[in-house]
Amino acid sequence: MFFKFLNYFSKSNLLVLILLASSVVNADWFALNMTRGSTDISNEVFELHMLIFWICVAIGVVVFSVMFYSMWAHTKKKNPIPAKFHENHKLEIAWTIIPFLILIAMAVPASKTLVKIYDDEAGDINIQVTGYQWKWQYRYLEDDVSFFSNLSTDLDEIYNLVPKGENYLQEVDEMVVIPAGKKVRFLITANDVIHSWWLPAFAIKQDAIPGFVNTAWTVVDKPGIYRGKCTELCGKNHGFMPIVVKVVEQAEYDDWVYSKKQEAIKLAELTTKEWTAAELVERGESIYEVNCVACHQTSGQGITGIFPALAGSDIVMK
């Protein structure tokens, strides 16, 4: 009976198995697997993942080998009279002790890595990360620098009017900038609903929960640009909340902090400036495109029942 079933299975599913096998062979290995990170911790997480993966593969090979051998060797045709026995104490002890030792082998390195991940004390730089629908706010606590980071992908790309760029939906108008080789601590929270701040290259994924602060940290030695995203469904534009971190040398970081402080001074001066009507329109348009268009739409019509229309609104007209 078993071989009849196997024969039927082989004929009906051979093509599917061949297609699946060919897709796996031709696929990039790292497209199907966890990728290496850019920090010591993220590389430890990768090595831990691969260790447990190969342990699971070995267990699977042993278990399925025994199972298929038993199905082949102990058929009714070969053994018309079944063996009768109740227990085997040596075997029971073996299959209790061996899994216990395997779990210990996985738990020890995992615990060591977890201890390092949660050692978030005494950061050289502390950055408060606040999730909003649908953007991030970053505040550098020591330097009194604060800004919002919004998706900057062109709307024409989103609506398929032009070809999509290399970093489609992974571009922002303001990047997080941190210095290389310094311990940076992130204090992660939210203003409205639950978000999740995820940077795979740093092995960081922390929920941003209103009223709570979760912490994470990193030390990145290699300058470059690293990208992540919100990974907690947070509403209509959940997919439009990218995270971009730029790692630079200390001197460049100091220059960036200075420039942000100068921007804050200029912004404060604008509060006392006398604006012309044309300047107000231009300024309002730029602010609307950054902060309002995601909810109230380019036309100002909003979304019925969710975000009210601004076009023709008495509040706007007044």
Go through the PLM ranges and name each one.
Residues T231, V293, P308:
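Cys/His/Pro-rich metal-binding microdomains
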Residues M1-D28:
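N-terminal secretory/membrane targeting signals
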Residues A27-L51, M71-R283:
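Non-transmembrane, membrane-proximal soluble domains of secreted or membrane proteins
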Residues V219, P242-E249, G302-K318:
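Gly/Gly-Pro-rich "capping" loops immediately C-terminal to redox-active cysteine motifs
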Residues K11, L15, L51, G60-F64, ...:
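Hydrophobic alpha-helical membrane-embedded or membrane-associated segments
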Residues C56:
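Active-site-proximal cofactor/substrate-binding loop regions of enzyme domains
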Residues A277-I303, G312-K318:
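Sequence/structural segment immediately N-terminal to covalent heme-attachment motifs in c-type
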